[in-house]
Amino acid sequence: MRDFESVDNNMMIGKLSAVEIADRFGTPLYVTDENALRDNFRKINEAFNRHMPTRIHYACKANTNLAILRVLEQEGSFIDAVSVGEVDISIRAGFAPNRILYSGVSVPNKDLKALVAREVLINIDSISEMRRLTKLVTDIPVSIRINPAVGSGHHEKVVTGAKGTKFGIPKDQVIAAFREAKELGLRPVGIHAHTGSGGLNTQPFIDVTQVLVAFANEIEEELGISLEFLDIGGGIGIPYRPEEKGLDLDSLAEEITYIVKENTSIPTFALEPGRFIVADSTVLLTRVNDIKEAGEKNFLGVDAGFNTLIRPAFYGSYHHAAIANRFSLPGEVNYDIVGPICETSDYLAKDRLLPKAEEGDLVAIYDAGAYGFVMSSQYNSRPRCREVLVDGEHASLIREAESLDDILKHQRIPSRLML
């Protein structure tokens, strides 16, 4: 969780007050601090490259805004994409295809054709996918994703590496998969696994590295395949709560890269952070519409709901909240911060001690840059909101708000109903 400066009780984002930004662009509004975004990437990039050559593949499913991707392209990031759409958005943002790794699941043939045409590196998820790919092309480099039977994550819904999940080739089929890839004419150059999302425990990252190292050595000994990179996926979490501490990134990088360097001849390490890079770079600003006392409950009704930020409703996730125009004042009242959606589960925060609020106040929801806008919806026929990028004292619109026309533009009434 980031610390923000306060000037005259106003929360500052860059050199601008949150109130000033909200007054200019309206609410609800996602606001990203470009300098925080760059700093986060540099921190993880430098931590790992200090010990061995490392490719940081930004997991763009966390946030695919073109401007954010452009910033990361400038910083030298690679991309982890999970759909053809993410591949194409990344290319439009300036990424060369050879900086994109595609890791799909349940991949249809039409997507395989598109990926081959775009010449991105495909991270094969299943033997079925591999066989279908070789009907289109052979003699291309590929990576193979395994299921390491090592799972972790902030919620059971984001654990991807545990035994029984849908991702990757099961451990007992890994050697056979690499053998078949070689026999089919593919060139396996990488091995990949992903444990889950949002972890603050170092052990799963160490465990999955050890699993991949063991397989890499077995693959080289049995099949004569010398891999070019080892990829442990993403999942590095951030401290969403004030009392939480983030991972010691330098220690983690040193320990993991040591395992790879000392036990393999693989020249390049790779990982796929998403949340770590974008989450705390962004706040969601939302205006107080309504204040309601209901028995022991005090509700702050704001103009953002789970249509805007679904993580609290979907995962039960904690996001820190503050009243941006009363930023330095002490807490007086416990509030539930709720939205305008017609669902009981529509809340952004529960039981938060905040300064006594008034209608028109501005609430800031922290750490909203990862899985925020990308998971938003038009539920209750509410258009999706604007996004803004702040660089010091400059604020730029990087996504326009939708309108009712945007909601309706792909809908049609059959002519027979117009009679």
Segment roles from a protein language model:
Residues M1-L121, I127-I140, A181-R187, A214, ...:
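A charged N-terminal "starter" segment
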Residues L37, K61, S83, L115, ...:
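Conserved, mostly hydrophobic/aromatic
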Residues R50-M52, E221-G224, E243-G246, G295-E296, ...:
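Short, glycine- and charge-enriched coil/turn segments that flank and shape catalytic ligand pockets
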Residues A59-N65, V84-G85, V105-V107, I127-E129, ...:
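Active-site beta-loop-alpha junctions enriched in small/polar residues
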Residues L69, S90-I91, L112, L133-T134, ...:
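Short glycine-/acidic-enriched loop or helix-start segments at secondary-structure transitions
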Residues F78, L101, L121-N123, S143-R145, ...:
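Structured core elements
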Residues L136, P148-D290, R382, D391:
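Active-site loop/helix belt of alpha/beta enzymes
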Residues I266-L419:
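Charged (often Lys/Glu-rich) extended helix/loop segments that serve as interaction or gating elements
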